[in-house]
Amino acid sequence: MKAPVRVAVTGAAGQIGYALLFRIASGEMLGKDQPVILQLLELPVDKAQAALKGVMMELEDCAFPLLAGMVGTDDAEVAFKDADIALLVGARPRGPGMERKDLLLENAKIFTAQGAALNKVASRDVKVLVVGNPANTNAYIAMKSAPDLKPENFTAMLRLDHNRALSQLSTKLGKPVGGMEKLVVWGNHSPTMYPDYRFATADGASIADAINDQEWNANTFIPTVGKRGAAIIEARGSSSAASAANAAIDHVRDWVLGSNGKWVTMGVPSDGSYGIPEGVIFGFAVTTENGKYTLVKDLPIDDFSQKYIDKTLAELEEERAGVAHLLG
């Protein structure tokens, strides 16, 4: 048996956490031969800690052969101790009448503290995925608060947007998602992100040629993917938890086990490619191998695409400016 991998999960008793933990413990994220130790963080309030205890009881009752151990805590330094993978799911949700900038600042406090805790106690090769929104900026804050860890260890989740875009294209074309490749979602995990199928193929044939409808792209496809989260809240009465958990598993699985040459979308610190300032955490197409991701470089950007990329970058720059004073 392999040595267990330590997986830290914040917001572990929340809706996404509940949809995530059982799949990690069953081996869906890291493979059916990889034992895991779950290190679970919840808020230091009685209700959250009691809920966490209940989730841990259920995990025990599944008798997962790969679950080598569990820790439940309200202390980030306990949760992140020697963590190989950290899924930062917990974030302050936007309350009624709350401005986006207030939400940014509330979350900045959380992710500054979590970045510092990771910096202090996590494995030096920890792979961090930020799921809690605003994910790109929260990942940026955590990265900046962990100066001893490599910036490339910090990523934000755009895989949900990527998967949503694949599904919309599948419906439009009547083709299965399994045969689709070379889709990319650029930018921020927000309604400004830009799902781009110019390079994408379905069973080897160009998707752009098959659709050949720029009006559908601009007026239906892009807004549908961008507003899908809001549509689910409207329909379900609460936010997309199972699909977010599924995307987190996809993101980490590909990062750790490799994407076999396929493009996947990850929010990663820019190296200056495509005119995105260095260090901004931005959605790019990447391929992954041996636990490392590589940006897909030199894709042509047409005027239509540039407009969307500029817009999502402007939003990220504005968010970054809004928290700059907290990062020294």
UniProtKB/Swiss-Prot annotation:
Record: active site: H189 (proton acceptor)
Top-level EC class as recorded in UniProt: oxidoreductase
Keywords annotated in UniProt: NAD, Oxidoreductase, Tricarboxylic acid cycle
UniProt catalytic activity: (S)-malate + NAD(+) = oxaloacetate + NADH + H(+)
Keyword set includes NAD: yes
Positions with a binding annotation for NAD(+): G11, A12, A13, G14, Q15, I16, G17, N107, Q114, V131, G132, N133
SUPFAM superfamilies the UniProt entry points to: LDH C-terminal domain-like (SSF56327), NAD(P)-binding Rossmann-fold domains (SSF51735)
Keyword Oxidoreductase part of the UniProt annotation: yes
Residues that, per the record, bind substrate: R94, R100, N133, R164
Pfam families associated with the record: Ldh_1_C, Ldh_1_N
Record GO terms (molecular function): L-malate dehydrogenase (NAD+) activity
EC code: 1.1.1.37
Biological processes, Gene Ontology terms: malate metabolic process; tricarboxylic acid cycle
Functional note: Catalyzes the reversible oxidation of malate to oxaloacetate.
Family stated for the protein in its record: Belongs to the LDH/MDH superfamily. MDH type 2 family.
The protein, known as: Malate dehydrogenase
